[in-house]
Curated annotation (Swiss-Prot):
It catalyses: O-phospho-L-seryl-[protein] + H2O = L-seryl-[protein] + phosphate; O-phospho-L-threonyl-[protein] + H2O = L-threonyl-[protein] + phosphate. Coiled coil: none annotated. Keywords: Hydrolase, Manganese, Metal-binding, Protein phosphatase. Its EC number is 3.1.3.16. One of its GO terms (molecular function) is metal ion binding. The keyword Manganese applies. This is Serine/threonine-protein phosphatase PP1. Mn(2+) 1 binds at D2, H4, D30. Mn(2+) 2 binds at D30, N62, H111, H186. Binds 2 manganese ions per subunit. Its cofactor is Mn(2+). Belongs to the PPP phosphatase family. PP-1 subfamily. InterPro entries: Calcineurin-like_PHP_ApaH, Metallo-depent_PP-like, PP1_catalytic_subunit, Ser/Thr-sp_prot-phosphatase.
Length: 255
């Protein structure tokens, strides 16, 4: 799930799950922005990708987009610590990242969620890279959409971009494509993970005490050879280092 520049928590994740190459890792995007150490976070992940390419896989999140990370911290961190040229090099890198992964032909993983334009997995395979993230359409939705318990079908998103989808759309898509589970990030959830649509979709968020503001846990999803899923939970700190009280996470909060 999302890391958002929380480098120490990324190291904790590897402590829990094992450092590469002892385990295979799939990350769901949002490596940068908001946290203080986006550069360490993305550089460690890319270094592992270079060293153990078949052991670590990095999907693209909505923050791996120049329009977004120009605003939410990564650009400023690059400029302050190095230079704008470095940020532009990362932009070129992010434009090449894959946007979805399929585990054992049964578990579909992406950062955001489903799209009204998505009927089958070949549509994802046909997305050309490198690419920027458009403001609407399939690629946008894969990185930006959210599940919503209160609706059926599709609805506009409070984010002002992309859409939300109901449990009926999850069931419809999974049944049509012979899949078991959708695994996605993109929303801070109190326990680090949260199920939706009769456990046919799971949201995973891996940045505990997100941004130093929330009292959420972080989670790591483990999938064994039989596709049995289990969760490792990184408990949140009891108080924020800033001395301010931590906010409770709203159900399916935004990130």
């Amino acid at each position: 799930g999302d890391i958002h520049g929380q480098y120490q928590d990324l190291l904790r994740l590897f402590e829990y799950g094992g450092y590469p190459p002892s385990a295979n890792f799939l990350f769901l995007g949002d490596y940068v922005d908001r946290g203080k150490q986006s550069l360490e976070t993305i550089c460690l992940l890319l270094a592992y990708k270079i060293r153990y390419p078949s052991k670590i896989y990095l999907l693209r999140g909505n923050h791996e987009d120049a329009k977004i990370n120009r605003i939410y911290g990564f650009y400023d961190e690059c400029k302050r610590r190095f230079n704008v040229r470095l940020w532009k090099i990362f932009t070129d890198c992010f434009n090449c990242l894959p946007v979805a992964a399929l585990i054992d032909d049964k578990i579909l993983c992406m950062h955001g969620g489903l799209s009204p334009e998505l009927d089958n997995l070949n549509q994802i395979r046909e997305i050309q890279r490198p690419t920027e993230i458009p403001d609407s359409g399939l690629l946008c939705d894969l990185l930006w959409s959210d599940p919503d318990q209160k609706i059926e079908g599709w609805a506009d998103s409070d984010r002002g971009i992309s859409c939300t989808f109901g449990a009926d759309k999850v069931a419809e898509f999974l049944d049509k494509n012979d899949l078991d589970l959708i695994c996605r990030g993109h929303q801070v959830v109190e326990d680090g993970y949260e199920f939706f649509a009769k456990r046919r979709l799971v949201t995973i968020f891996s940045a505990p005490n997100y941004g130093g503001e929330f009292d959420n846990a972080g989670a790591l999803l483990s999938v064994d050879e039989s596709l049995v899923c289990s969760f490792e939970i990184m408990k949140p700190a009891l108080a924020s280092s800033s001395g301010h009280p931590l906010k409770k996470v709203p159900k399916m909060g935004k990130s």
